[in-house]
Amino acid sequence: MVCSITKLAQKLISIPSISPKDLGCQDIMIDFLDNLGFEIKKININDTKNFWATRGFGKTLTFAGHTDVVPPGDYKYWNDDPFNPVIKNGLLFGRGSSDMKGALASMLIASERFIKKNPNYEGRLSFLITSDEESSAIDGTKKVIDYLISRKDTIDYCVIGEPCSSSKIGDVIKNGRRGSITANLTIHGIQGHIAYPHLADNPIHKGLPIILKILSIKLDDGNAFFAPTSVNISNIHAGDGINNIIPGSLFVQFNFRFSTETSEKEIKSKFTQILDNNNINYSLNWFFSGNPFITKKGLLIDNITKSIINLNKVKPVLSTDGGTSDGRFIASMNAEIVELGLMNNTIHKSNEYVRISDLEKLAIIYEDIMYRLLT
């Protein structure tokens, strides 16, 4: 017999909600929460669907997540249709099963169980759901947070269902994330025949020593929560593949993942200082993804840790590694934030799956967190 969590997860996975399209996932969630007595506010912007659901009053525990998924890629690498969820040997396969429709199903079932047992709980239980997490993240959680701040609304504790477990549910939880900023640098030269270099200005030759200087930038040593700030090249391009032309420009894209020891301003200053000291013609633009954030030990981490130890017999490791998450937007509300979800070993891969037993384990832990913070 397929349990209610699995059925709900299958229902969500069967919808091809490639970011930022929701295509009906949130309608399923909204109907579910409406039946539990939640007040729902839809905040839809352009192609993005968002909603904010609340039940109760007082200190607010929010469960946050996203209904969008990354594209499945070439179907030939899947054993089954990625949007036709199938169960094999206790595993539920499908795009979004781990990231993060399985966790959404666990959240919903956990809230249903909690409310049935504790209909008059103290405080407020809420959901913040978006369909724009995997792509631009422009019209998603950020806009919902802007709306909540404009209304002077609050979030005290937030559990984000991102898949950060490694080998056992809850063995790794995220209590922060690094900041991210991208530099798009174009070094301009003069195109010419490669046999007459004195009549051209090769931007690759000019750019190579500058690239090495940028890669050697040391911004900080990190701290107890974060590794040192890092810089990596993500894209580089010059020329059109012709072997007798000196290209007219060199494009290099750098990404910085930065700790709380360094600011966006400091990164930009060090970067442009290197460029300006080398007398080159360049153009530069930046894309800022978000600042780092950290939740230090407090009520949320303490209670989540106790839940995981008691219910899954493992002590969680606190981590801030990995990519950015929507926690960077929620952090602006001064909330305590922890990311706790399913396994991350198959996310964004073909044949993504989740163990059905893990859906139930996660729901039990989520329900216990509700009990600890709202009763």
Swiss-Prot record:
GO terms for molecular function: acetylornithine deacetylase activity; cobalt ion binding; succinyl-diaminopimelate desuccinylase activity; zinc ion binding. This is Succinyl-diaminopimelate desuccinylase. It comes from the Bacteria. It catalyses: N-succinyl-(2S,6S)-2,6-diaminopimelate + H2O = (2S,6S)-2,6-diaminopimelate + succinate. It holds the Pfam family M20_dimer. Pathway: Amino-acid biosynthesis; L-lysine biosynthesis via DAP pathway; LL-2,6-diaminopimelate from (S)-tetrahydrodipicolinate (succinylase route): step 3/3. The gene is dapE. It comes from Buchnera aphidicola subsp. Schizaphis graminum (strain Sg). SUPFAM superfamilies: Bacterial exopeptidase dimerisation domain, Zn-dependent exopeptidases. The keyword Zinc applies. Its EC number is 3.5.1.18.
